[in-house]
Amino acid sequence: SLNFLKRMNQGLHQLHPDAMLIAEDSTDFDGVTRPVEFGGLGFDYKWDMGWMNDTLNYFRSNPFFRGSGYHQITFSMMYYYKERYLLPFSHDETVHGKATIVQKMFGEYEQKFPQARALYLYMYTHPGKKLNFMGNELGQLREWTEEQEQDWDILKFPIHDAFYHYMHDLNQLYLQEPALSAWDYRREGFRWIDCHQENRCIYAYERRANRERLLIILHFSDLQNQQYTVTVPDCAALEPLLHSDWACYHGSVEKNTDLILTTPTEKGGQVTLPLAPYSAMLFRIHTTVEKSVSAPPVQAKKPRKPRTSTGKTRKTAETAQ
């Protein structure tokens, strides 16, 4: 069977060099994405089932106990460079009583959406290609079935409409920022800044490609009025690109994209930032202030809403749960 897979993948790559061959494999079999000529199976990408399970288990958990599961978020980078991984939120996770991605989040209806927004910013800034199943971008509450279309009418509710626009802007930003994808499979493309905040459920890391550098700060607890001090190597200022809790996304933070100057220290630029509960932030790192040219933050045109069906709509989104 291994020889069959190797010969099949070699042949497909020769006949269709633009085709992507992706393996769904939950084992630790070595070399799934290694070229056949180097002893591998020759797939282009492999689903990171470990990342998916650890991440969703973490977000299902009560925030009070997330400190004990803190390293469910950090563990994926311990093995990440062994394969060319793809991060999957597939249809398998929205069927057979498993609930949709938004529904998996801990808490009541209003609590689920800020966590889902933070989750997706984490996903999009984690190394690896992304797989998202249709309906995830709507914050859909009903499990998928092949017998009916997506619940487009749910976009009539402000929290879902804001979530849809958030996912649109996140996708646009992902396409615009090379640091989020160009060096996915190079070790120098990712660096932990802080992964020892178990009691506060805070994570900070850097993504880079060539001279482009981005800082990501995640806060996965429900603690209010938090201040976080972080030191970033070779950083003179931070430019906010996206905040999962901006008011335009149904959050609590007014949008502000002004440069944030850091205080020089021996280890780098230091800054103290306020953290909203269940939030994630993405910044561009500027090594100098005078010579840097700030690219404008994402101001994508408003996405067209998908065509809605003519069927009867629900009175409230929450009744769909």
Regions found by a protein language model. Name each.
Residues 246:
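Non-heme Fe(II)/2-oxoglutarate
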Residues 1-147, 175-178, 185-230, 234-237, ...:
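Conserved alpha/beta catalytic core and glycan-binding cleft of carbohydrate-active enzymes
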Residues 255-295:
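C-terminal beta-strand-rich structural cap/linker in extracellular carbohydrate-active enzymes
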Residues 170, 238, 278:
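A residue-level signal for conserved active-site and pocket-lining positions in enzyme catalytic cores
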